[in-house]
Curated annotation (Swiss-Prot):
Belongs to the peptidase M50B family. The lineage of its organism: Bacteria, Bacillati, Bacillota, Bacilli, Lactobacillales. Its cofactor is Zn(2+). One of its GO terms (molecular function) is metalloendopeptidase activity. This is Putative zinc metalloprotease LL2128.
């Protein structure tokens, strides 16, 4: 139980953290202010406020993660007319806060919280402000109306004590070029593909190499029909009962289809050909003789093998998606419960199985996130493409409606898949 839980949390944490970091990295490279980078959902169990204005958090529920960008959704701190605040301005002005305001007055921090006290802060009753374009704040200070310039990177301490940076238009998501928006949205899936490839490369090194497709035997297990028949590592099986076997798949097909009958193997050994007789036995549900295929153990063979396995996994996922579209069924989908079960199986099987599961799930997440469904990365990229074609973005109201439709759809699907996983795990 504990082993399964730890494995699940590690796999989930790595996949989500890498995915969200892809969004964060491209957003920052595009000049977009990242409010928060979160792994998990729900209440925070860890938080760190970085100097660049990004809050890094780990949250208690392993149900996903997110990157909150400035200008995305409900991002603004509401300040009411007449609201009390305290301002920290440039040091030269703090000495005499009643002096005439000048252009050099720069506000660094704006405190709206009654629970936070700032040293040498100027009290103000706010009457007007603009933190997006003109960057100023105006209000009553010691009985006079004062207007202060606000620093581009100034922070606001909200009523609950949370300190956030203001977001001028130039650092908001909407102000980024459409290409940079697309990179920001594609960054998550891209990182999942990279993680999947790296995990498969690690797996090839752990396994000692990449399975070769040739008809050469890599290893013969002792006490098996092949061992008793005299087969050795390095032998090439050229034919089975007269049927040519050009690669390993041909060899496996002929042996597994024998139904336990004696086979005549034409073997090439050290340039010489000989025929050996072997009778397959049923092992783990199929007929086998106890031979293993040879491995490519070169450094670059292992590297390229990781790429090949990643490509094969992606192909298998696309085939599964095609089957799902042709014949929709919840049994073909899996949510957190199914992933938890797979994590338990991988933990019991050992480290290679854990790495394999990590690779498969990462590539799976990358592909699924590119579906053109609002709220998923693919849906956001579609909106970016529409913006590129139209020459302007959809209004925030329209984008919000489209996103809400996607949220409802994904929420209903999530509940249905999770319930089906529970029934499959505990009822069936």
């Amino acid at each position: 139980m504990i082993e399964t839980l730890i494995t699940f949390i590690i796999i989930f944490g790595i996949i989500v953290a890498i995915h969200e970091y892809g969004h964060l990295w491209w957003a920052k490279r595009s000049g977009i202010l990242v409010r928060e980078y979160a792994v998990g959902m729900g209440p925070k169990i860890f938080a760190h406020q970085a100097k660049d204005g990004t809050l890094y958090t780990i949250r208690i529920l392993p149900l996903g993660g997110y990157v909150r960008l400035a200008g995305w959704g409900d991002d603004k701190t509401e300040i009411k007319k007449g609201q009390a605040a305290s301002l920290v301005v440039s040091k030269s002005e703090v000495v005499n806060p009643e002096a005439e305001n000048s252009v050099s007055n720069i506000v660094r921090r704006i405190n709206l919280s009654e629970h936070v006290e700032l040293e040498e802060a100027i009290p103000m009753l706010i009457t007007e402000y603009d933190f997006e374009k003109e960057l100023f704040i105006e209000g009553e200070v010691f009985g006079e109306i004062k207007r202060y310039s606000v620093d581009h990177d100034a922070t606001i301490i909200e009523e609950d004590g949370t300190e956030v940076r203001i977001a001028p238009l130039d650092v908001q998501y909407q102000s980024a070029g459409v290409f940079h928006k697309m990179l920001t949205n594609f960054g998550g899936p891209l990182n999942n593909f990279i993680l999947g490839i790296i995990a498969f490369i690690v797996l090839t090194f752990v396994q000692g190499g990449v399975p070769s497709t040739t008809n050469a035997i890599g290893q013969v297990e002792k006490g098996t029909p092949a061992y008793n028949a005299g087969l050795k590592a390095g032998d090439k099986i050229e034919a089975v009962n007269g049927t040519k076997t050009a690669d390993w798949n041909n060899v496996v097909t002929e042996i597994s289809g024998s139904k336990g009958k004696e086979l005549k193997l034409e073997v090439s050994r050290s340039g010489k050909s000989e025929t050996l007789s072997v009778t397959p036995k049923k092992m783990d549900g199929s007929y086998r003789v106890g031979i293993m295929q040879s491995m490519k153990t070169g450094f670059f063979d292992k590297i390229t093998g990781g790429f090949v396995q990643a490509g094969q996994s992606a192909t298998a996922i696309f085939k599964a998606l095609g089957s799902l579209i042709a014949r929709p069924s919840l049994d073909k989908l899996g949510g957190p419960v199914a992933i938890y079960q797979l994590s338990g199986q991988a933990a019991r099987a050992g480290f290679p199985a854990i790495v394999y599961l990590l690779a498969m799930l990462s590539i799976n997440l990358g592909i699924v996130n590119l579906f053109p469904i609002p709220v998923l990365d693919g849906g956001k990229i579609v909106l970016n493409i529409i913006e590129a074609i139209r020459g302007k973005a959809l209004s925030q109201e329209k984008e919000s409606i489209i996103t809400m439709v996607g949220v409802v759809f994904m929420l209903v699907l999530f509940v249905a898949v999770t319930w089906n996983d529970i029934l499959r795990a505990f009822v069936n």
